[in-house]
Amino acid sequence: EVRVENFRATVPSSKSKLEFTGVGEGGISTCDLILDLRGGTPLFSAHEKRDGYFRPDPANPGAVAEALFTLSDMTGEFEKPRYVDYDAGICAHSSSRITGCTKCLDVCPTGAIEPNGDKVKYDPYICAGCGLCAVVCPTGAAKYSLPAGDSLSDRLRAVLGTYTKAGGETPVLLVHDDTFGRDIIALSARHGRGLPGHVLPFTVNQATQVGLDTVLHALALGAVQVAILLPPSKRADRDTLLAEFEIIDTITDGLGYGKGRVVLIEPDEPDQLEAALYVDALGAMPTGDVVGMGRKRSILRLGLDTLHRNAPIQPEEIALPAGAPFGKVEIDTEGCTLCLACVGACPTGALKDNENMPQLSFAEDSCVQCGLCKNTCPEKVISLEPRLSFRDEARSHQVVKEEEPFLCIRCGKPFATHASLNHLTQKLSGHAMFQGGDRLDRIKMCDDCRVVQMTVNDDNPLAHGTVPIPRTTDDYLREREELRAKAKQDMKDKGITDGEA
């Protein structure tokens, strides 16, 4: 839907140029195709990614003609694929209006994603299918749906497995799209040296859809390097990919494989592509048969475990850069009151309580470093530490803090924790409603006993004074007569008569 200012109808008899009639008014047009010849600010952000929006340079007749011919061929009905499958159940965007992860909102170039309560909402008609949201999503709530299911992982296993069984060594996986990437590889094969023998082309829908899970899976299958061939139309997205590749470099370097296992190639000509590929191959990687099934976190863990198991160096943990989807939650147990607000906010179940006693436990393998627990904590005792742990205890919940339940001082029923009651008592000790008597002790009673104590105790902080009896005219007249009688009696006692001065 496009709103147009000064909208006027054209004169059918216009000859040398278009003429318009009537008075300019606001108009609304619902259309599938837009040809923008204003030469000014585009109507949309990331306009080059919008389907059906053409914005050629009005000073270039050739570009305008090409756009017109392209538009004239766009007749009939078209199907637009849904590029992203979104699972709101594991989204870490926010909880109780407290914001956590905003990665997909930050990287979407077209504005197809917007907040929707505690979750986000995708507009499939605006989405251009770049896949960046799925790349940065820490939980896998956003999953790229082309290809569907686990077919991408199956293709990786088939390509690298077949190459290895045939005796191939040091395979380099060249990831490219089906347009620019395919064409530049074809030009290199026809007019240049083509691809080196150990470079395996791997076609995907968009080169920008490849993230941590795909790269680590390929390395675990034996690829010595993953090269992403980025077309010119995607150069604006390079920073997002480089941030993800920094995490991979940190992991592979920490395991002894060295850096540079994933690279970004941005050629404009076939010669530049060949120059980037005809280099000395990196050292061999261990070959494993990793079946990439399930969502993102499962594939990541399978790939990481394989790489760690066969690594030259096998550290127990690796420090990661900020923003990594792995890490630990540091909790100051002295300041923690076991209110368990963090448990309710955690979208992945990394933080868990115990229904039988006041207890907080944490599973590092499930943590995505979204920050919801940190932002929700009322005591501000939680901090995040991005790291990758290979310890066995990281895979299960470990107790962070536990206490024996506090018993009601009146009936003995367990109803709270010592830490929370001590904190509450300290906060309310100076409050006027809890001064004197046993008012402060009511905090240490369960809900039932607290009501009973306030009912039977005369020291009620909410009680008001005695209500005065309303006075009437008769009351005032009676008081007047009583005062007169008293005055006469006083005069009589003093020996004063009514006639004396």
Show which residues each predicted segment covers.
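Flexible gly/pro/ser-rich segments immediately N-terminal to CXXCH heme-c attachment motifs
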Residues: 119-130, 331-336, 359-369, 397-398, ...
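Flanking helices and flexible, charged tails adjoining ferredoxin-like Fe-S electron-transfer domains
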Residues: 66-71, 89, 132-217, 221-222, ...
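Basic (Lys/Arg-enriched) interaction patch that binds polyanionic ligands
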Residues: 107-140, 341, 345-348, 357-376
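Short secondary-structure boundary/capping segments
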Residues: 50-53, 188-192, 240-246, 463
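Ferredoxin-type iron-sulfur electron-transfer modules and their immediate structural context
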Residues: 1-107, 111, 170-183, 202, ...
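Terminal amphipathic helices with adjacent charged low-complexity linkers/tails
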Residues: 116-157, 235-245, 261-266
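Conserved short loop/turn motifs at secondary-structure junctions
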Residues: 90, 121-126, 204, 232-237, ...
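Cofactor-cradling patches in redox/metallo enzymes
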Residues: 214-222, 226-264, 269
